[in-house]
């Protein structure tokens, strides 16, 4: 791995992808591939990759994603058109965990990208490498590849990108675009919210009571339409309200007929009162509903929590089932391969045994046929059988005498056949002669020479002893 740190340039930029298989930490080479990195960072800032799937998985090769349509043919760059490839001499497809742009040909880069799962020298100078996966998140890439693959290298249950997060932006001048589609969607949602909606009381826990209250209000509004309304009109059964009006109305029809201006003013006042009473009715309805909701708000919270927990359980259960299915598939595949290997080994062993047995059986049958033929020829019994035996003995004697009289031929050992070798007939047993002379046991051979080393301590002692003896002889003289 040390050659990777030496050859690859330093990174500048960091993006985090949150997928269903875990987080993936990507470091960018923004100096070596500026266009590809700018395109990738801006798309991440705009949330372009959110909820997109990894639509292509090739085991031990690549994992491809970044297409919002999920077909492998969609996606566009932030420049509005495909941008050129960016190759660098220090960036090669020599390991797993590299991030590169996917394209359909030269200079045809859009929004799709892929991760490498191993060495891919055939992709060099064809795809732009702009990042690498760092840390332990590289194991999450391997989890992305652990899916069942169907036709056209598409996974059966593909993983997807939940969201993206730019941890370090190397381009300070990037401004996320406002998508036209989102603007239209917002306008349509605004129009829908302004339109009058139908009330669905079945969604409420107290739907029947709310529906009855709504019917009562509608009936009262029909009866009191065009008249001024007060709390006396709506709440007739309330004992706290007096039935006597606070101000008595003066029935003066003459003044009303004479003064048209006053009538117009009174009409305006009535309309204002009607509007006020409509607003009062709405407030009262809201208060009733809010009071009923306040009675037991914990139920709705518990229901929401239970629904969230149920969804989490379903998702976790589905993931566990997928894992178990993959594990079971692997075990079945391994058991099948093991069974096939055992069958092959047993077949080869049987074939070898059969060949050995067949060869031995053939030799045995040949020998048996040979002796059977000899036995059939020698079917005579009695005197004829004795004469035949004597004839064989005479033939053997003549062979011996001939071998003794003829001088032995000197042949090489390799040329002589063991079965046809007749040298043993003329062989003479001879023993090695031992001399009766007595030899010195210390002498191994007559030609043996004694090696005398003056430095040997034994020889030194002998010299000293001989010197002493010579001195003693001289003194005696």
Swiss-Prot record:
Gene3D superfamilies: Cyclophilin-like (2.40.100.10). As part of the spliceosome, plays a role in pre-mRNA splicing. Probable inactive PPIase with no peptidyl-prolyl cis-trans isomerase activity. The gene is cwc27. Residues 230-240, 247-258, 280-299, 311-353, 430-442 have a biased composition (Basic and acidic residues). Signal peptide: none annotated. One of its GO terms (molecular function) is peptidyl-prolyl cis-trans isomerase activity. It holds the Pfam family Pro_isomerase. PANTHER family: PEPTIDYL-PROLYL CIS-TRANS ISOMERASE-RELATED, SPLICEOSOME-ASSOCIATED PROTEIN CWC27 HOMOLOG. Belongs to the cyclophilin-type PPIase family. Residues 208-218, 259-279 have a biased composition (Acidic residues). It comes from the Eukaryota. It is found in: Nucleus. Residues 11-166 form the PPIase cyclophilin-type domain. GO terms for cellular component: catalytic step 2 spliceosome; U2-type precatalytic spliceosome. The keyword Manganese does not apply. Transmembrane segments: none annotated. One of its GO terms (biological process) is protein folding. Disulfide bonds: none annotated. The keyword Metal-binding does not apply. Residues 308-381 form a coiled coil. Keywords: Coiled coil, Nucleus, Phosphoprotein. Residues 203-355, 401-477 are annotated as: Disordered. Part of the activated spliceosome B/catalytic step 1 spliceosome, one of the forms of the spliceosome which has a well-formed active site but still cannot catalyze the branching reaction and is composed at least of 52 proteins, the U2, U5 and U6 snRNAs and the pre-mRNA. Recruited during early steps of activated spliceosome B maturation, it is probably one of the first proteins released from this complex as he matures to the spliceosome C complex. Component of the minor spliceosome, which splices U12-type introns. This is Spliceosome-associated protein CWC27 homolog. InterPro entries: Cyclophilin-like_dom_sf, Cyclophilin-type_PPIase_CS, Cyclophilin-type_PPIase_dom, Cyclophilin_A-like. CDD domains: CWC27_CTD (cd22288), cyclophilin_CeCYP16-like (cd01925).
